[in-house]
UniProtKB/Swiss-Prot annotation:
Name this protein carries in UniProt: TxMMSK-03
Organism, as annotated: Conus textile (Cloth-of-gold cone)
Description of post-translational modifications: Contains 3 disulfide bonds.
Family statement: Belongs to the conotoxin M superfamily.
Chief place of localization: secreted
Amino acid sequence: MSKLGALLIICLLLFPLTAVPMDGDQPADRPAERMQDDISFEQHPMFDATRRCCNAGFCRFGCTPCCY
């Protein structure tokens, strides 16, 4: 029984419960903060206003919608 307890203590020290994301950490629970961090695609520096989309090379950097 002491071996099982020692194993449990070692596991809790290596993988604390605080490392697991809690429900309050989800971005869906904080829509105001999520909207402040969200950049509109029209305001993205790599957005092509004449074609109304981003070149395919810039899509890797988070620019959407993509022109293919």
